[in-house]
């Protein structure tokens, strides 16, 4: 009967994992409100395991969905297949129906065979809380052939846990470590044939002892199924043991005894061997363990759910109660995983340290590594403490002696790897530049990789992180060491360099992905307001994707540029009472002191601040610009009396008259107060504390003029300006703009438009000059030789803005209405050119040579503050 103990080729065992070929043919789902064509796929899951879940490709069909795709699955004879038919949509997928297949029932009904078997499954779907029929799904199964004779009575399979077996004598069947040549089954797997002895196996549980009370006290005879698999005390494969009903199974439940099952221990997945039982007449051990050698009495801890056992011949194997499998190899330590590279070689992944190794890890290996790492960390800490034993410990007192003073609110200074950087907790960003020196008005920024520091004596020096050197010499062009803390010896302005520095800050702080803004042209303002204010400020740094509802198109930048242009035209429209024109004939905008007529005006100003910051951050332009004093306020610069001339000429002339005349001789009684009317309500504001009783005299006249000028720029707009700057600072920190002056900021926000030279010359008028005068010819020659940036600066120098109205130079607006570009002959040849922005007039002295005119003109448009600096 020796042949009876060998497994038959091409026959699988009920609990052996094998490959199943599943062919998904077609489906006829019942779908309400059916679309003409459906894009669908089928998802198949084995026993609900994510690792055994596969999908077909997507196919398009109408009444009948066709796939004809083959899927290979790893199953056992008791596996359950869950099939789901999905319909693909743009936003989400829709479940058309589900079906399930119990392979054990299929095998029972077909004599243990699945050879190209066709199944038509009824799909089920949920409709209003009830399960209804959802159509049909046709599949083919081609897979394992299971010998049902190994099961008691030759019929039913068990429900999922491998059951132990006993021979006819009642003694346990245990394997012997003598191997036979392997045979190949029909699924490509390999099964080994071994001889077994009748000795019982010893058990060494790793997770604790089982209570004897949990065991059944009733013995049941084992029915002979007629199969001679237990003849002469031998069974197929390894390691297989038998158990008595009194002995609990390895999964902790008592089940009827079953026939012996083949098990193939391997590093992957195997069947679960049952625990051994004592011989007839012996009482079971209450501890479930036997005396082991000293080396085995204190084994290394196994992962949860694992157990170590030993065969009679002394060979150790391991039981995984989680997956009900056995293996010869000891389980990996926690956090380790075994993988295979493309060349079929095994390697091991340590998820704890995110490292890989070819060597199989053991508990001793992990302990040695942890011990080495602990010693290494202790040694590094000791070395760091040793290297810093003579260093001066930093404290809060050191910041008190910092020549630059304390950091701005919300900023923190840190140092990693020897280099200092700064953290802005307000915007959650970091930077190398010191915010106290970044963008100083009198100093341009340091070159990339440079840093400014101070010695304990307060002497400034510079660190070049590129070459790791230090120097007292200022690396910026035109700066001399030790001259006024680095004030420029020769003026050097590069708007292009500043702009690239700003763009670098924007790109280095950009966030991934994109943000969608969907608006309608009819409700552009409100749609944009609601969406921008509902977003987190930092999300507005993501790439913009603008959608115009009702219009088809993809936004690759063009729609965003149009959105900025259209929305800026809306939000800055004076009809909303948020902004007003700076003057009757000045098309630049300033905040309207009467904006409080709108109860939500501060929220709108916060929104506009975010919007303007987005325009700068994303490099887009707006339609209309602000006044230069407003740009100065954004840069935290103090407006001057000269700035008042362009926005309120009458007020400016009044202050100039007070400045140039003796108030005591004129008999004027002025006090440090000023009246203001808003919406018909007159309010009085004190320029200084107790100003109502302080009279203006010749001694305090300068203070009065300064306070009056400041009040004129801030009257009634303090809250609005703060809300605007808060919204701006949420998206882009205002510190990033400190490199620029107010005119450069206007250029960056409003854009640099191309200038038509022929239109400029044709629309220019002359006073005390003619177009044939040599100074005029030299002037136009210089302008033609300029690049577009300098032409814009010349236009800004004369007209006060870099933007041209619709219609070009012929439509320029002055203080008294339309005013063309004018060149007037004024002054001596030693004078610099002067401009009158209210009248679009350039005072050009009669220079004697082309070189002199070019030098004076270029110097004037660069140095626009203060005249007569020869």
From Swiss-Prot:
Tissues with expression: Detected in heart, throughout the brain, placenta, lung, liver, muscle, kidney and pancreas. Also detected in spleen and peripheral blood leukocytes.
Residues of the active site: 838
Biased composition (Low complexity): 290-299
Chief location: nucleus
Recorded metabolic or biological pathway in which this protein acts: Protein modification; protein ubiquitination
Function: E3 ubiquitin-protein ligase which accepts ubiquitin from an E2 ubiquitin-conjugating enzyme in the form of a thioester and then directly transfers the ubiquitin to targeted substrates. Polyubiquitinates POU5F1 by 'Lys-63'-linked conjugation and promotes it to proteasomal degradation; in embryonic stem cells (ESCs) the ubiquitination is proposed to regulate POU5F1 protein level. Ubiquitinates EGR2 and promotes it to proteasomal degradation; in T-cells the ubiquitination inhibits activation-induced cell death.
Identification of the protein by name: NEDD4-like E3 ubiquitin-protein ligase WWP2
């Amino acid at each position: 009967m020796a042949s009876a103990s060998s497994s038959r080729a091409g026959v699988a065992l009920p609990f052996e994992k094998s490959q199943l070929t599943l062919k998904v043919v077609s489906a006829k789902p019942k779908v309400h409100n059916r679309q003409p064509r459906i894009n669908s796929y089928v998802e198949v899951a084995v026993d609900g395991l994510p690792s055994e879940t596969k999908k077909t490709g997507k196919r398009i069909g109408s009444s009948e969905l066709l796939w004809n795709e083959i899927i290979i699955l790893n199953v056992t004879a008791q596996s359950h297949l869950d099939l789901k038919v999905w319909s693909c949509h743009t936003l989400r997928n829709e479940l058309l129906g589900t079906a399930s297949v119990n392979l054990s029932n299929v095998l029972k009904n077909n004599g243990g065979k699945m050879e190209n078997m066709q199944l038509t499954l009824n799909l089920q779907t949920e409709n209003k809380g009830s399960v209804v029929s959802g159509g049909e799904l046709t599949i083919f199964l081609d897979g394992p052939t299971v010998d049902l004779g190994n099961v008691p009575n030759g019929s039913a399979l068990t429900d999922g846990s491998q059951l132990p077996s006993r021979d006819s004598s009642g003694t346990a069947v245990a394997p012997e470590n003598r191997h036979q040549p392997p045979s190949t089954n029909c699924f490509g797997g390999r099964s080994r044939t071994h001889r077994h002895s009748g000795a019982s196996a010893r058990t060494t549980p790793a997770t604790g002892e089982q209570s004897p009370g949990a065991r059944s006290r009733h013995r049941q005879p084992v029915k002979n199924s007629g199969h001679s698999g237990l003849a002469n005390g031998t069974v197929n494969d390894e390691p297989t043991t038998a158990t008595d009903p009194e002995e609990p199974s390895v999964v902790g439940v008592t089940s009827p005894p079953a026939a012996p099952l083949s098990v193939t221990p391997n590093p992957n997945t195997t069947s679960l061997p049952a625990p051994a039982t004592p011989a007839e007449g012996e009482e079971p051990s209450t501890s479930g363990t036997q005396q082991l050698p000293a080396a085995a009495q204190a084994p290394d801890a196994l992962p949860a759910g694992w157990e170590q056992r030993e065969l009679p011949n002394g060979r150790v194997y391991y039981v995984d109660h989680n997956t009900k499998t056995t293996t010869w190899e000891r389980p990996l330590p926690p956090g380790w995983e075994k993988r295979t590279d493309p060349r079929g070689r095994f390697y091991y992944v340590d998820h704890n340290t995110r490292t890989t190794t070819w060597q199989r890890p053991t508990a001793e290996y992990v302990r040695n590594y942890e011990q080495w790492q602990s010693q290494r960390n202790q040694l590094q800490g000791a070395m760091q403490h040793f290297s810093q034993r003579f260093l001066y410990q930093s404290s809060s007192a050191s910041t008190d002696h910092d020549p630059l003073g304390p950091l701005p609110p919300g900023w923190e200074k840190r140092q990693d790897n020897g280099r200092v950087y700064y953290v802005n907790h307000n915007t959650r960003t970091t930077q190398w530049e010191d915010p106290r020196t970044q963008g100083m008005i009198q100093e341009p920024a340091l070159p990339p990789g440079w840093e400014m520091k101070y010695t304990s004596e307060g002497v400034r020096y510079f660190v070049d992180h590129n070459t790791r050197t230090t120097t007292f010499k200022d690396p910026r062009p035109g700066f001399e060491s030790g001259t006024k803390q680095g004030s420029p010896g020769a003026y050097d302005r590069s708007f292009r360099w500043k702009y690239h520095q700003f763009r670098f800050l924007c790109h280095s702080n950009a966030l991934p992905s994109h943000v969608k803004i969907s608006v309608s042209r009819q409700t552009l303002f409100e749609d944009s307001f609601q969406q921008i204010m509902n977003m987190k400020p930092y999300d507005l740094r993501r790439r913009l994707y603008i959608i115009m509802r009702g219009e088809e198109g993809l936004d690759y930048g063009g729609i965003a540029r149009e959105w900025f242009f259209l929305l800026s035209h809306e939000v800055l429209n004076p009809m909303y009472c948020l902004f007003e024109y700076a003057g009757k004939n000045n098309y630049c905008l300033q905040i309207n002191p009467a904006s409080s007529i709108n109860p939500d005006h501060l929220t709108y100003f916060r929104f506009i601040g975010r919007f303007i910051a987005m325009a700068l951050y994303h490099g887009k332009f707006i339609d209309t610009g602000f006044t230069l004093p407003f740009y100065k306020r954004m840069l935290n610069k103090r407006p001057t009396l000269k700035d008042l001339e362009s926005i309120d000429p009458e007020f400016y002339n009044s202050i100039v008259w007070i400045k140039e005349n003796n108030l005591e001789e004129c008999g004027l009684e002025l006090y440090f107060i000023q009246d203001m009317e808003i919406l018909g309500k007159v309010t009085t504001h004190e320029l200084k504390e107790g100003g109502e009783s302080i009279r203006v005299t010749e001694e305090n006249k300068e203070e009065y003029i300064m306070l009056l000028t400041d009040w004129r720029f801030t009257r009634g707009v303090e809250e609005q300006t703060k809300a605007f700057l808060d919204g701006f600072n949420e998206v882009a920190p205002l510190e990033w703009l400190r490199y620029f002056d107010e005119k450069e900021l206007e250029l960056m926000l409003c854009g640099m438009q191309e200038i038509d030279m022929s239109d400029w010359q044709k629309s220019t008028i002359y006073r005390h000059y003619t177009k044939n005068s040599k100074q005029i010819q030299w002037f136009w020659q210089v302008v033609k030789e300029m690049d577009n940036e300098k032409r814009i600066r010349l236009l800004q120098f004369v007209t006060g803005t870099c933007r041209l109205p619709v219609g070009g130079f012929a439509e320029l607006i002055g203080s008294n209405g339309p005013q063309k570009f004018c060149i007037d002959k004024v002054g001596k040849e030693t004078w610099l050119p002067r401009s009158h922005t209210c009248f679009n007039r350039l005072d050009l002295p009669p220079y004697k040579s082309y070189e002199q005119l070019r030098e004076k003109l270029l110097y004037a448009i660069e140095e626009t503050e203060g005249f007569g600096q020869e």
